[in-house]
Amino acid sequence: MIGPVIKILEAPEEMPAVEALQRAVWPDSETDVVPAHVFIAAIHNGGLLLGAFVDDQLIGFVFGFPGLETTPDGPRAKHCSHMMGILPGYRNSGVGFALKRAQWQMVRHQGLDHITWTYDPLLSRNAYLNITKLGAVCNTYRRSEYGEMRDGLNAGLPSDRFLVDWWINTRRVERRLGKRARRPLKLHNFSQANLQPLYAPQAPAGSWPRPPEHFSPLEGRLALAEIPSDINALKEADFALARDWRFFSREIFETAFASGYLITDFVYDEGRSFYVLSHGESTLEQ
């Protein structure tokens, strides 16, 4: 597919299409649809709404607004990227990357250097985009961030989320978004370095992998943490097992972040998904 055309959306007559797109992306969630007047209010106060178009059809959008974060030196301005939605038929085709790259350009023009957003840690596709492709990092785990969610993609599981940091002026991010983007890491890159995963999911023949009862102590500079490769398919096949993965992964990441680790990469290879945990901040510029 030829890359989508990315446009800034700011006129009232453009908002109904964004409302309709939300209903297509998040079915059964009418009460969660962001209405036109909220988009307009945000846009008039520094917010940013970008749309992706193919043949003049809106197929995706990303929406964010200015925010403040608490630092030891006082409040600091950032951009809060709140929503991104893409029609199912256009996922895994580079639309999300194109939207985030355009957002990166626009927010830099606003004079900001930090974008944050949340996503479900168990969504491999989102992790691959956010961490591998965009170069965001994470050391914040939020339990039940949005309370009970009712839409078709999120219903049933606790709404635990990663809060990721995208330091948009760093060499790390500029390299990921450049024309010569770094090749994604593969499992053999870690096996060559004699780095083994923290745990091996139990995988009975013909069934979904199950989280182990225990995991190895976090030691050294790097660690690998495996998650299910397709949590949505797992939810449909065995919802109780999907919940087990939610609580197991919660323990893994809360333990890692409390011990000074942060997520700096993500590996999808051979049908398996792994987060790369780094101790300290030595990899932020890479």
Where do the language-model regions lie?
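Conserved GNAT acetyl-CoA-binding A-motif
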Residues: 107-120
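Short, glycine/acidic-rich beta->alpha junctions
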Residues: 44, 98-99, 116, 122-123
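Broad gene-expression machinery/nucleic-acid interaction feature
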Residues: 78, 114, 161-163
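A conserved beta-strand-loop-helix scaffold within acyl/acetyltransferase catalytic domains
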Residues: 4-88, 120, 142, 264-269, ...
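Conserved acetyl-CoA-binding loop-helix of GNAT-fold acetyltransferases
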Residues: 86, 92-107, 126, 241, ...
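Intrinsically disordered, low-complexity, positively biased terminal segments
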Residues: 11, 110, 123, 129-132, ...
